[in-house]
From Swiss-Prot:
Keyword Mitochondrion: no
N6-acetyllysine: modified positions: K3, K39, K94
UniProt gene name: TXN
Phylogenetic lineage: Eukaryota, Metazoa, Chordata, Craniata, Vertebrata
Modified residues (S-nitrosocysteine): C62, C69, C73
Paired cysteines (S-S): C32-C35
Protein name: Thioredoxin
Protein's organism: Bos taurus
Length: 105
């Protein structure tokens, strides 16, 4: 399941409540073509990796979160463990997304 983040508070809360689990954050926008293309794959990964927390941040709805995380383009995927960023890449690269998850869990 992918949790939609609506605020900076909800983002911090999700990172904190994840504990030891890997957190994967998809920063996207409704108008972004590549974001729309990879969204179903991101959701399928959330079903496949039940021990990983998947979050989705709409950069237009949560500009403060996107700014704090220094997101420059969409889609950007960031990876967190224990509240600390442990990885990041931009672009709708399915293989790299799944490979990075496998590397970090």
């Amino acid at each position: 399941m992918v949790k939609q983040i609506e605020s900076k508070y909800a983002f911090q809360e999700a990172l904190n409540s994840a504990g030891e689990k890997l957190v994967v954050v998809d920063f996207s926008a409704t108008w972004c073509g590549p974001c729309k293309m990879i969204k179903p794959f991101f959701h399928s990964l959330s079903e496949k990796y039940s021990n990983v927390v998947f979050l989705e941040v709409d950069v237009d709805d949560c500009q403060d979160v996107a700014a704090e995380c220094e997101v420059k383009c969409m889609p950007t995927f960031q990876f967190f463990k224990k509240g600390q960023k442990v990885g990041e890449f931009s672009g709708a690269n399915k293989e790299k997304l799944e490979a990075t998850i496998n590397e970090l869990i």
